[in-house]
Amino acid sequence: MDLHPSSYHDSLEELWDEEEEPEEVETVMKVVPSTYQQYLDVFSKVKAEKLSPHCACDHHIELEGSLPPVGVIDSLCKKESDRLRAYISENLEKGFIWPSSSSTGAPVLFVKKKDGGLHSCVEIRKLNAVTRKNKYPVPPMNQLLNVFNGSSIFFKIDLRGAYNLLRIKDGDEHLTCFRTKYDSFEYLVMPFGLTNAPASFQNLVNDIFQNLLDVYVVVYFD
């Protein structure tokens, strides 16, 4: 695994324009009914793990006060170090993060999974504490259920890596910086755990389905 700058993609556009892997197409075709195979690209794991372009719904981080304090880099055992290196490598490869020189930075913590593995997570509570809250309206569940009245056929669409499909607003990336013993990095996509992330995602999906809301589509996140 190479964490040096020479291993980064030369341009974000190059990463976005990579062609679909034939093996991935074959895998998707086996599980997608023939009726929907004209839309194979929307089922693609490869495309879901590429950096999305900026859009009007990019996640904006507005601070109410000063920058959160810089987090402490804790000592790690070998298992934690291996997991951290894998996380950094995976997200650099996808184009979801890049090196940062931000004057702030959150530490990385590890949570044990049921299978004994480790889940790495950025401790961003101090950033959330100084972020202005987005009061985007979220429809109550009873209103969503009322739309179903009289319907008998339902489809559920679940988005792969949902939050990571949304970009951080240009210029706000440095606020998402996390510090490690290898380097500091910042997110180009909206990571899980950010305050206002649910509101930003609801706004994005509502914008996509604007003309179909409460006609054929309801949007709900849990």
Cite the ranges covered by each PLM segment.
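Reverse-transcribing Pol proteins
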Residues: 15-138, 215-222
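Reverse-transcriptase-like RNA-dependent polymerase core
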Residues: 41-70, 111-119, 134-136, 142, ...
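General helical secondary-structure elements
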Residues: 12, 79-81, 156, 175
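An acidic, Ser/Thr-enriched, charge-mixed low-complexity segment/SLiM signal
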Residues: 1-22
